[in-house]
Amino acid sequence: PIVFFHTEFENKVGEHRLEVVFNKSGSAAGAVSENHFSSIGRACPAPVLNTVAEKADLQPLGHEAPSSRYPCQRFFYSGEEVYFNSGLPEFGQAANQVSYTILRAVGNLSRVRLLGRGGGAGPCLLTPEANCLGPQEVSYGWAPLALASLTEEPGFAGLDEPDAGARQLAEIYEGNLRGFWLPEGAEPAALEFLDRSLFEISDRRISFQAFYQAGPDNCLVLRLLNSSGQDLKLDIG
């Protein structure tokens, strides 16, 4: 159910931001993006993606100018659609459009003209390599959020909730992460375990983050994330 995009281009210009823009199938009040340890929702600030003229609007004294671009990890979703990326941590949103920043060309770490930021945004250093001149490749994806429920066999809870569905589709976009245990010094034949899952989580509102050994008895520790905001009970088998 996922559309995969792979874009190749040659950047010949410095000091700019290049985006890929999606027209949404319908308007939405905002977007929700995956961030560290949680998902964060943001209201839509404008009917269209910000233009230079809109960015130039003066802001009341003591008030921060609204941001037009936001951070994300693997995905964000808006309305009935979810958007994935491979290493593209910035997106934009409007009522009927969303965007991914696929290149930021930056020739200076900070400029002396930014006197309003006491000391600037950092040392005034030239960063010509950060203009990323030359051939570039980026990957990203799109899917209807409703199709998440078709990715699993019946019996798993939570896929009808947007955040759980988006996370499930993100796993498919990246390639499902499987946990498996190999004995020390295992022969290559042990790779047959790759087709088996070490455990299964019954509720897709709980996502698997990591597992490792810890403690004097080398117990197996599972790190899980509950992004639903609810108290949940689940079976791990």
Question: How does the language model describe each region?
Answer:
Residues 1-237:
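Terminal accessory/anchoring regions of large secretory-pathway or extracellular enzymes
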